[in-house]
């Protein structure tokens, strides 16, 4: 699942500068894993 999430996150990280999008996503991915 992490690989799938990373693939959709990487392009967005470059678009949205990352921090505001990556932090809530990581919190949502932790319980899933």
UniProtKB/Swiss-Prot annotation:
<dbReference type="InterPro" id="IPR012602">
    <property type="entry name" value="PyrBI_leader"/>
</dbReference>
<protein>
    <recommendedName>
        <fullName>pyr operon leader peptide</fullName>
    </recommendedName>
</protein>
<keyword id="KW-0428">Leader peptide</keyword>
<dbReference type="GO" id="GO:0019856">
    <property type="term" value="P:pyrimidine nucleobase biosynthetic process"/>
</dbReference>
<keyword id="KW-0665">Pyrimidine biosynthesis</keyword>
<dbReference type="GO" id="GO:0006221">
    <property type="term" value="P:pyrimidine nucleotide biosynthetic process"/>
</dbReference>
<dbReference type="Pfam" id="PF08052">
    <property type="entry name" value="PyrBI_leader"/>
</dbReference>
């Amino acid at each position: 699942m992490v690989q799938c999430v990373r693939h959709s996150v990487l392009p967005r990280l470059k678009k949205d500068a990352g921090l505001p999008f990556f932090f809530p996503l990581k919190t949502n991915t932790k319980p899933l894993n």
